[in-house]
Amino acid sequence: MHYSIIRRLSTQPKLANIPKRKWKSVVGLEVHAQIASASKLFSGSGTSFGAPLNSSVAYFDASIPGTLPVVNRKCVESGIKTALALGCRVNEVSMFDRKHYFYADLPNGYQITQQRAALANNGIMTFPVITPGKKVYYKTAKLLQLQLEQDSGKSLHDDQLKRSLVDLNRAGLPLMELVFAPDLETGEEAASLVKELILILRRLQTCSCKMEEGALRVDANISINQEGDPMGVRTEVKNIGSVRSISQAITYEINRQLETVAEGGVITNETRSWDAENRRTVAMRDKEVLQDYRFMPEPNLPPLHVNLKPGSKSTEDLVSVAALSIEIPELPEDTRQRLVAQYSLKPETAIILVNEPILLDHFLSINRSLSEVPTKVVYNFLINDFLTYCNKLNLNVEDCSINAEDIRDILKNLHGENINLQAARQLIELLHNNPTIKVQELIDLHNLQQICNLEQIEALCQQAITNQPKAVQQYQKGKSKALFAIVGEVAKLSAQKANMKIVVECLEKLLKPPKK
Amino acid sequence: MRRHLQWNIKQLTASYAEGQLSPRRLTELALEDAKNLKTLNAFVRLTPEKALQAAEDSLKRYQNKKPKGTLDGVTIAIKDNFCTEGIPTTCASKMLQDFVPPYDATVCSRLKKAGAVLLGKTNMDQFAMGAGTVDSLYGPTKNIWSEELDGDRWRIAGGSSGGSASAVAAGICYAAIGSDTGGSTRNPASYCGVVGLKPTYGLLSRHGLIPLVNSMDVPGIFARSISDCVDVLNTVAGPDTFDSTTIRKPYKNLTLPEIDQINLSTVRIGIPKEYHCEGLSPEVLETWSKVADLLECAGASVRQVSLPNTAASIFVYSILNQCEVASNMARYDGIEYGHRASDERSTEQLYAQSRAEGFNEVVKTRILTGNFFLLRKNYDHYFEKALRVRRLIAEDFLKVFVASQEDDRVDILLTPTTLTDAPLYKDFAGLTNRDQCAVQDFCTQPANMAGIPAVSIPIRLSQSGLPLSLQLMSNSLNEQLLLTVARWIEAQVEFDSLQHRLNLQSTL
Amino acid sequence: MLRLLNKRFYCKFATKTKVRPEKLNFKQLTHPTKVPQTPVKAAFPNTSANEIELDPKSIQLLERLALVDLDSERALETLKSSIQFADKITHIQTDNVRPLYTVLEQQQLQLRNDLVTEGDCRGKVLSNAKVTDEDYFVSPPGNIPLEQ
């Protein structure tokens, strides 16, 4: 495939021959979410990330002969809660199956999963799709199945000595597999779905969603077809390690398929891996090997019954779905709608706030305790100034050491005209670098108070007028916009501390044009 | 004959309590017997140090008048597919030849907790796949009732728990643990002339029992009397949090009534006609007829019933067995444990070679066939089909035990266990493994299909001087009635499990 | 005493063991018997002529999935006859009969509390592995198809 390498040198793939509107892309996601529980799905060993090699391994996890699985109730509850939050029908009876294949990190030679009769089916997710530069819109994807299953161990490949080193700490960790219908079309839609899913799972506390720890893994099934044709042959893309990669990988693969077809090639049903470093998908195997998993019911686990009766309570062996549904917290979409209704926010603003749970917390708590400041000011500052700062530094909001109290103090000072917006922005940086010092102290320390004294301002204005004769001239000729140059000069002279409102008033008074 | 061998467990522990016999002495004698009877090849491994230590501890407890219970100081043998901590557990296969489990099977730990003395691990067919205990890494086990133990005219002990049956039949120990998937406890019990109980599926824990067919395996109990069998059952039965296929109901100890207290007038015996199949020997038929008659004389109602799907059982069993084997054996790749070959070029090569070297022909064929049945295209036609027929077989039993009409119900089914007395090894070895199992397991398999309890009791000797046994079956969790009736029959026939030792009266 | 014991066992028994007089006469019955005195024939189709589709490709697939080799013609024959054996139940009427996966299908599946009760036994977990390296299990590289 040498010609494709040459093509890759240009960052934008050329699609000269196909008018894009004739082709549709189809994307279906498979998400594996590691359930947040203290012990594994079928054994009593621990689940902490980063435990010493092969130490979170019970005999069952290592497939020692004679050992048997025993189901962890917390995992069943987490699966049910997640299913309910995603609008699924929880099945009264579900069963476990063995899925057979050989691999070094699969000691049993099979994985225990749920294939025939899963915990839940027929869910649905409706979520906002945010594409930079485009208007926000809502997309719906059906959730076909939610099943409980075991994770496999980890094998490290030692190419030098031609061997694999196997650590079974991860073997047997509880997973929920969420199989979505191929209802999506673009990488952005997929990324948005996953973002929404993460918000939901974190609120439910059923999954940490830390993709860097492997707690959330996303595989994408991608195909293209011409409008009106049935779905094309699909490829599966694995090894997507972050939310950002989701959009990149899927977009890349769609384009790769379109190009392949444009050049007269065919898409083969294969598994491809996302190479984040080189930003492309790579075929994982050169020969697609025929696979038959020979699913068989897990004989050591009789069927799992759950109680669907409304108003029921959970007992030791019978989990009540009704009792769990009461525990479901407010879901992100409901929060967005509530924010829009309660605070008259624009939908886009609500989306941004809900997307960043800490930001949302700040917003709500500041609004409550600082009723004199208009809501608009609060969220504008949080989004335009605070969030922007974090993004600039590539910092996650939760990793920023600035808390709600600090922001509240900034806003209080801002509203009280003690400081201006520039100073407020400076304070963010100062606070982040000096987490132990309070806002008031910093204002004093760095002399951030606004200059509001009329005399001082007049003096500054006079100075600025002197420094900007050309602008003055233009302004007096009638070009009102020229005032900003002079205002800017005042700002510079005052080290950004002059109260801009007063400055503008003052300048206007001083520079009253002689004739109308 | 050693006098104490004539005792049952209750009498034995009574003599311990009175100081007449010491557990230590008994264990020493047992180990001696085991050595002397090495030709039987009942044991694959004796554990004399551990046994003597346990016996010593038991003795101390009796001296302090604080014995642990009914099994304190009683000698027991364990089939080598039960995990015993620190003691190699091989399933008589090269694949697990060096496997030393890091834990005890629940059955073993309960026996240990009760103070029983574990003498060692007994021989079996490789991975419990067989009906003769002839397919073992350690060679075949011989039946102590054989006319001759040398040469080629010895009799098989039955299987796959032949070693355990043999050890009890020879008087080396008082009881033994086996496993029963299609008859693997009742079959050798029948040939060796001892009691063999397959309890209700789920009554005993399978944690630590290396599985053959998970949905049918049950730990089995060998003893020389029903009373001894019950003593062991009471010690090991009951739910286990490590095994999700144990019945959750708490277990209540069985107490069987005294013989003269047993009233059979309320008992309804069923004779399922399909159990008279081709190949049933005239002597077994005669035995069956006589015992049915005895029961009727004692006031029980005896009638013929029909279990129409009985003959389908062996076919269903072969499918389900092979499918589970294909799955259960997938773990043997040499990485975490077990035989590891030398071809390290790829996992595929290593696994394939380890498995080729570690498994015998029988195991390999079952794995292949099982995988064939589990292929997606074959799954419905074979595996699911077999499971549907399994329900028909189970429903046959349910219909007679819980029939809608009170008059149509029976409590106990009386059938043969094996179709003949113990075959000669040379005749048995000439058959394929499948035919060996198919013929001998005809009467025993259906109970495993349905999960119901079944017990084999020796009745009399055949013309060849070999034991003939019969089987009783009952509905799930009905061991109380099942063993009561068994006990009554036992008392009528007065079969002496140690009769083969009579010749040695002067020497022992 | 022990030597005598051995000798007895290794001798052919010229005379049978003294048979205890049977108190029960197995040939005498009091009631008309309920035990069928003739075998009940079970009718199963003869499937030995059944065509079993096992082309080399299927066999290769099976060998790869099972990682067990069919190393002889005899093994292939055994496989075929096992399949024919299984075919014998095809004719049994099972419409509307649900598969019996486990006899415990009515019981609630046992659920365990979410507590860490196992693990932390690396030494024991690794104890039976023939090859380990610094607390890892060791395996050859994977996903390389078998040589044909």
From Swiss-Prot, chain C:
GO MF annotation, one: ATP binding
Subcellular location: Mitochondrion
GO CC terms, sorted: glutamyl-tRNA(Gln) amidotransferase complex; mitochondrion
Transit pept. (range): 1-10
Family annotation (SUPFAM superfamilies): Glu-tRNAGln amidotransferase C subunit
E.C. no: 6.3.5.-
Pfam families: GatC
InterPro entries: Asp/Glu-ADT_sf_sub_c, GatC
Protein keywords: ATP-binding, Ligase, Mitochondrion, Nucleotide-binding, Protein biosynthesis, Transit peptide
Reactions that this protein is recorded to catalyse: L-glutamyl-tRNA(Gln) + L-glutamine + ATP + H2O = L-glutaminyl-tRNA(Gln) + L-glutamate + ADP + phosphate + H(+)
Biological processes per GO annotation: glutaminyl-tRNAGln biosynthesis via transamidation; mitochondrial translation; regulation of translational fidelity
Highest taxon of source: Eukaryota
Xref: HAMAP family: GatC
Family that this chain belongs to: Belongs to the GatC family.
PANTHER family: GLUTAMYL-TRNA(GLN) AMIDOTRANSFERASE SUBUNIT C, MITOCHONDRIAL (PTHR15004:SF0)
Function: Allows the formation of correctly charged Gln-tRNA(Gln) through the transamidation of misacylated Glu-tRNA(Gln) in the mitochondria. The reaction takes place in the presence of glutamine and ATP through an activated gamma-phospho-Glu-tRNA(Gln).
Subunit structure, interactors included: Subunit of the heterotrimeric GatCAB amidotransferase (AdT) complex, composed of A, B and C subunits.
Protein name: Glutamyl-tRNA(Gln) amidotransferase subunit C, mitochondrial
Protein species of origin: Drosophila ananassae (Fruit fly)
Top-level taxonomy: Eukaryota, Metazoa, Ecdysozoa, Arthropoda, Hexapoda
